[in-house]
Amino acid sequence: MKNKSVEMLIEGAKEWGIFLEMFHVEHFQKYYALLLEWNQKMNLTAITEESEVVIKHFLDSLSVVKSGKIKEEEKIIDVGTGAGFPCIPLKIVFPKLKATLLDSSKKRITFLEEVINKLGINEIELIHGRAEDIGKDIKYREQFDLSMARAVAPLNILLEYTLPFVKVDGYFIALKGREIEEEIENSQRALKELKGEIEEVKEIKLPYSDIVHHLVIIKKIDNCPTKYPRRANAIQRSPL
């Protein structure tokens, strides 16, 4: 990456209270290079310009620390991780996180295997599968301190895919856009059914841009009923 983009990354991260060393920067540079290389043969991201990737992928992912819920050595799962956002940037900065990245695309998982090998990232598991299936597996169900999703699905649908992974007293963090009030209003039934409650909604303004988004921080207050998550077609056809 060019010096200007590196400076944007370093200074932007400081706004989240993160102080990057040069080895962190080198990891982000390798990640960016791999993203560009693999994006030529598969659809990973429409955002490829250097400064845009820094702002809309790297700094956006790191903004999760503003939730106050990122703690070293905790177990986290990134549901529908895509090209690795937000979890790979978080693992670069917080290497002791015990991370699981879940995606339904085998091609994207293959890309992520290359990323973690080239970056030398440890304590990370990649799963090729669907959240509605893996969320029923006792190896993963209610095993995580924190789940995250940056997916574009409405919040009430995301909750059914993500909350079953979270331990009681753990958290789900949804990275959502500027307009969030209606989604929250439409998620009240899902929150009640899936045993979650909104603890806080944080407004985040991304550095070097006019982009505003929100972190919706949801606490798991009891075990999810075993009937959730339902099959994907049921979730889409009749969302909670």
From Swiss-Prot:
Entry superkingdom: Bacteria
GO cellular component: cytosol
EC class (word): transferase
Sequence positions that bind S-adenosyl-L-methionine: G80, F85, D103, S104, S105, A131, E132, R150
Location relative to the cell: Cytoplasm
Single GO MF descriptor: rRNA (guanine-N7-)-methyltransferase activity
Alphabetical list of PANTHER family matching this protein: S-ADENOSYL-L-METHIONINE-DEPENDENT METHYLTRANSFERASES SUPERFAMILY PROTEIN (PTHR31760:SF0)
Name of the protein in question: Ribosomal RNA small subunit methyltransferase G
Gene behind this protein: rsmG
